[in-house]
From Swiss-Prot:
Catalytically driven reaction(s): Endohydrolysis of (1->4)-beta-D-xylosidic linkages in xylans
Free-text function comment from the UniProt entry: B.fibrisolvens is located in the rumen of ruminant animals, where it contributes to the animal's digestion of plant material by hydrolyzing hemicellulose with its xylanases.
Keyword Phosphoprotein assigned: no
Domain GH10, chain residue ranges per copy: 1-337
Family of this protein: Belongs to the glycosyl hydrolase 10 (cellulase F) family.
Protein name listed in UniProt: Endo-1,4-beta-xylanase B
Active site: E150 (proton donor), E255 (nucleophile)
Pathway(s): Glycan degradation; xylan degradation
Species: Butyrivibrio fibrisolvens
PANTHER family in the record: ENDO-1,4-BETA-XYLANASE A, GLYCOSYL HYDROLASE
Length: 635
């Protein structure tokens, strides 16, 4: 008995997949054996349809009818056709992952926004083009579309580039266009998160679904259902489910997962119990007629693929499969909600080792290796638990001399977040540089102040790379450091204090620790009013001296020889106040240090390089979490 068979009498069971799943045979086999529906996690969002190059090359030709490309969507559609698996289309209209240039005159971000009628014409043409391509070339494959995604925020319509340029009725227009061009058998959905919250539930029912139902433009409500172990309460969720169901619309559970950062047996049992409780709720609502649930989709296949580890900044174990397609207790709990125990068999994936290898995607010839930057007798941070700070290399396998990027992940000085390591390193590797990720000293317990140890780590790392410049093929080239969040504080500390850090090892004493350039991403800068308190506490302890606070308040420490800096952050950053980047930029200006400073209006803290891999939930580079995992097991 598998999931799709157990739930066939009631509703479709699906999973979201990324391009990495699609190119890993074991994952596609798991999908085909267990599920009868899937969603493309990332590659069918607006930015992947809109052809930037074509539209910018001939803006007059495409002014009212943007050029589209389907190269990202086609592999998923082909897989669905070949394997006879139905698809949910996700998503046509969203405030995220829709390029700003789509809204601008001549498709140029440096031009003013186009007028309402122009943007509506573009929207209609875009929706028509996507639906026509899919329905002509892959008829019957996509059974439902998320037409509009996530337009409600803080008890009102979300302020977005759509409301700024078109107005709050943009979602109605989108549904009008979708209804006009969708095949009769295709269902049209509104999709959102936190849909069980009473304030959001009521607003969606009245202001979003109400007018769409009145105009007969909508067929279903999508409840994303990114759940926590203690939120929402099942009764609150059930109430919302039944209230949406009372509209007569189909209900899809579109992005189901349950964030859980504890992999212990006890915690995974609790996860299983909660999954069974929710699936029992779905079945009860379906059988009683209180909600016409027609599809439930898990938001990816395996724990290791989940977007939550990057989003939550900690490893998450939120799904029902893990590792080599192994079934967790939660898998059997989901089955038990639908069928009797005696009809449930143990799931044993019969896949070869070759099936677990990425296939069909170009893989660069990268020299990857790790090297400790300290000898054991040089490094004595008391809460290291056997960890030694190290560099992980991403080098081109050739003899070409290249510039070097040293990446410093963030993590509040509590950890080195994996999604802020390898993703960034590979971005620069793909642009022709050699790259390294530094796993520096952190303290997940926040009990043993780090003081200058992270600064000494990055100073040694710069010297270590330069000492081995010939081996790494970077001799005579620039070495730039790039940090994220607290990792930016590490980078910034070196930028202003490189002269202070003396290396006692004679092999490194005469090697410069000054980087040639610095990139600071959503940086922690100050220890003053706008500080990130947890970072400062982990670094300096609960009772730092005034001298320590001043030393590590980087806006007060800029020198005449501070390297050139590139700084970026978002206005919406809710973790590190945007004033941090302004403070450092102003200090650089006063010292006449070359710099660039960008503050983007939208975007959350932790965006890293915001590329396809990031938004698909892939992070890689788990090696950066070594000290944290050692501490976890030790403490």
């Amino acid at each position: 008995m598998n999931l799709k068979t157990a739930y066939e009498p009631y509703f479709k069971i699906g999973a979201a997949i990324s391009r990495w799943n699609l190119h890993t045979p074991a994952h596609t086999k798991l999908l085909a054996e267990q599920f009868n529906s899937f969603t493309c996690e990332n590659d069918m969002k607006p930015m992947y349809y809109l052809d930037r190059e074509a539209n910018k090359k001939d803006p007059e030709k495409y002014n009212l009818s943007p050029a589209l490309t389907f190269e990202n969507a086609i592999p998923y559609l082909e897989f669905a056709k070949d394997n006879k698996i139905a698809m949910r289309g996700h998503t046509l209209v969203w405030h995220n992952q829709t390029p700003k240039w789509f809204f601008c005159e001549r498709y140029n971000e440096n031009f003013p926004m186009a007028d309402r009628e122009t943007i509506l014409a573009r929207l209609e043409s875009y929706i028509h083009g996507v639906l026509d391509f899919v329905q002509t070339n892959y008829p019957g494959i996509i059974y439902a579309w998320d037409v509009v995604n996530e337009i409600v925020d803080e008890g009102a319509f979300r302020k977005s580039i759509w409301t700024e340029t078109v107005g709050e009725d943009f979602f109605i227009k989108a549904f009008e266009f979708a209804r006009k061009y969708a095949a009769p058998e295709v269902s049209l959905f509104y999709n959102d998160y936190e849909t069980a919250q009473p304030w959001k539930r009521d607003f969606i029912l009245e202001k979003v679904l109400g007018p769409l139902i009145d105009k007969k433009l909508i067929d279903g409500m999508g409840m994303q259902s990114h759940l926590l172990m203690d939120h929402p309460d099942i009764s609150e969720y059930r109430t919302a489910l039944e209230m949406y169901g009372s509209t007569g619309l189909q209900i899809h559970i579109t992005e189901l997962d349950m964030h859980n950062a504890d992999p212990s047996e006890e915690s995974m049992h609790a996860l299983a119990t909660r999954y069974q409780e929710f699936f029992q709720t779905y079945l009860d609502a379906k059988k009683s007629g209180k909600a016409n649930i027609t599809s439930v989709t898990f938001w990816n296949l395996l724990d290791e693929n989940s977007w939550l580890s990057g989003f939550r900044r900690e490893t998450s174990y939120p799904l029902v499969f893990k590792g080599k397609c192994e079934a967790k207790e939660a898998y059997y709990a989901v089955l038990k909600a639908a069928v009797s125990d005696d009809s449930i068999d143990k799931w044993v994936p019969d896949y070869s080792e070759e099936d677990y290898k990425l296939q069909g995607m170009p893989t660069p010839d990268i020299k990857r290796f790790r090297e400790n930057i300290w000898q054991e007798n040089e490094y004595n941070y008391e809460a290291s638990y056997g960890f030694i700070p190290n560099l992980f290399a991403y080098l081109h396998n050739d003899d070409v001399k290249r510039d070097c990027m040293l990446v410093i992940p963030g993590g509040g000085y509590c950890m080195c977040c994996s999604h802020e390591g390898e993703l960034a390193a590979m971005e620069f590797y793909n642009r022709g540089m050699n790259a390294f990720v530094l796993s520096y000293t952190t303290d997940i317990t926040m009990s043993v102040p780090l003081h200058k140890q992270p600064l000494e780590d990055i100073s040694r790392a710069v010297r270590f790379i330069r000492k081995n410049a010939s081996k790494y093929n970077i001799d005579g080239k620039k070495l730039v450091i790039m940090g994220f969040s607290a990792g930016s504080h590490v980078c910034g500390s070196l930028a202003v204090h490189f002269d202070d850090v003396k290396d006692n090892n004679p092999e490194y004493a005469d090697i410069s620790g000054r980087p040639d350039g610095v990139i600071l991403s959503y940086p922690v800068i100050t220890t003053g009013r706008y500080t990130h308190a947890d970072s400062v506490r982990t670094l300096l302890g609960a009772n730092p001296t005034d001298e320590e606070l001043t030393y590590f308040s980087l806006e007060k420490q800029v020198k005449d020889n501070t390297p050139p800096c590139f700084i970026w952050q978002t206005e919406e950053d809710s973790v590190v106040p945007v004033e941090n980047s302004y403070l450092f930029a102003n200090a650089l200006r006063e010292k006449k240090i070359p710099f660039a400073h960008y503050v983007f209006p939208r975007g959350f803290h932790g965006l890293t390089v915001a590329n396809d891999e990031f938004f698909s939930g892939w992070s890689g580079g788990e090696y950066s979490m070594e000290q944290t995992m050692r501490a976890r097991f030790a403490v």
